[in-house]
């Protein structure tokens, strides 16, 4: 049963400005080492990071009014399987919320281009 849906869009130019202004502190506060390393291997690093940021925001929105239960951006980690399909690893506070809400699956979709990154997350609860 679908219990939550969230979507987010990020302007790449605004993301680049924030990244340049706040530097490594910004990236390390939002992203895990795995997410940063993945994006560094890509041609358009900022687009990949912005898509991951949008995905994290989409997941938070899908949880709705329970946002205060997730204490750290890094508790929601966006990874890719061998085929390149994105998936989410929940850690610490996000994992506790996932268990509490009986979320069995998160369907995640991300896309990016030169100007924007977008993500959609759908939370599915086991019966």
Question: Where in the sequence are the language-model features?
Answer:
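Core catalytic alpha/beta fold that binds nucleotide/phospho-ligands
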Residues: 1-127
